[in-house]
From Swiss-Prot:
Keywords: Disulfide bond, Knottin, Secreted, Signal, Toxin
Cystine crosslinks: C43-C57, C50-C61, C56-C68
Lineage of origin: Eukaryota, Metazoa, Spiralia, Lophotrochozoa, Mollusca
Tissue specificity note: Expressed by the venom duct.
Protein's UniProt name: Conotoxin Eb6.21
Family to which this protein belongs: Belongs to the conotoxin O1 superfamily.
Gene: E1
Residue ranges listed under propeptide: 18-41
Length: 69
């Protein structure tokens, strides 16, 4: 009987959480887009100025000329 009660309460919580999140889906999607844009790496194309390899799209920065190759 205890196991059935626990399963019932768990199902109620999951249903309530799903119903509650439907009304907030627009805001949730916008937030995930903002987070993704922060994770997107901007890079300098070949011939552009650079100071380290991770700035270049091809991951190679010439230290002699400070340009992406």
């Amino acid at each position: 009987v205890l196991i059935i009660a626990v399963l019932f309460l768990t199902a109620c919580q999951l249903t309530t959480a799903e119903t509650y999140s439907r009304g907030r889906q627009k805001h949730r999607a916008r937030r995930s887009t903002d987070k993704n844009s922060k994770w997107t790496r901007e890079c300098t194309r070949s011939g552009g100025a650079c100071y380290s390899h991770n700035q270049c799209c091809d991951d190679f920065c010439s230290t002699a000329t400070s340009t992406c190759i």
